[in-house]
Amino acid sequence: MTASLSLGWPAPAKLNLFLHINAQRHDGYHELQTLFQFIEHCDYLDFKVLDTPKLKLHSNMSSAVADSDNLILKAAKSLQQRTDCQLGAEIWLDKRLPMGGGLGGGSSDAATTLVALNQLWETGLSLRELGEIGLKLGADVPVFINGFSAFAEGVGEKLQNVEPAEPWYLVLTPQVHVSTAEVFQDPDLPRNTPKLSLESLMNSPWQNDCQTLVAKRYPQVAKTLAWLLEYAPSRMTGTGACVFGQFEQEQEAKDVLAKLPASIQGFVAKGANISPLMLRLAQC
């Protein structure tokens, strides 16, 4: 096979529209219920297929090796091992999503790597099989491979496609890094939210069980959330630090973005129930 270049594979961000922690298992993992929705704000990856199993990553990130970089290479290596593929790839990452913000950027990069290389290497795995590989890389990876907004249960691996409204979001990124591990290890984290049916959850007020704890531990998150709540219904996504406000119209979100204090960064993006990654895959 001669080297070929495939451009513009999106790795979209996600929002947790709600996140409920139901229990802690004996193995330390947490049972949860959450609703994932994609937003049209993405990292982008380019791939060049190589005739040898070599894997090489280029990134626009200043740090030498970041978590997302590791996951990209781990994803590619895992696909090689699962399929005994003897091809390799040169990969370019255009990193646009904030790191460690609860938007799933590293997991999304890994998912896009698996989906793209499965196509380009012609390894022929189904999305379900790719999801099995992805789950070993991170609990959020399967939802990005699944490619549709989803209600997730268990530790996040049990997915059911859903179609919530697709509003505009203003996403703000406080300049702090929240450790997911520390949040889930904190004794003050609520772990007893009752499990509810999907129908009940979709018709109940949405909340993030991690939000109160994170806001208490990270004043910048609390300050940013309080500012955004002045303009729209707002919550934290994942374990933070990013928070989002919901708007019916794009211009409404942009008007609030224009008022943003200089100390806070943010962007406007539309909710998407079909992942931009699936739309890119359909072009192949």
From Swiss-Prot:
ATP binds at P98, M99, G100, G101, G102, L103, G104, G105, G106, S107, S108. SUPFAM superfamilies: GHMP Kinase, C-terminal domain (SSF55060), Ribosomal protein S5 domain 2-like (SSF54211). The gene is ispE. Pfam families: GHMP_kinases_C, GHMP_kinases_N. Coiled coil: none annotated. It catalyses: 4-CDP-2-C-methyl-D-erythritol + ATP = 4-CDP-2-C-methyl-D-erythritol 2-phosphate + ADP + H(+). It comes from the Bacteria. Belongs to the GHMP kinase family. IspE subfamily. Catalyzes the phosphorylation of the position 2 hydroxy group of 4-diphosphocytidyl-2C-methyl-D-erythritol. One of its GO terms (biological process) is terpenoid biosynthetic process. Pathway: Isoprenoid biosynthesis; isopentenyl diphosphate biosynthesis via DXP pathway; isopentenyl diphosphate from 1-deoxy-D-xylulose 5-phosphate: step 3/6. Its EC number is 2.7.1.148. This is 4-diphosphocytidyl-2-C-methyl-D-erythritol kinase. Keywords: ATP-binding, Isoprene biosynthesis, Kinase, Nucleotide-binding, Transferase. It is an enzyme of class 2 (transferase). GO terms for molecular function: 4-(cytidine 5'-diphospho)-2-C-methyl-D-erythritol kinase activity; ATP binding. The active site is at K14, D140.
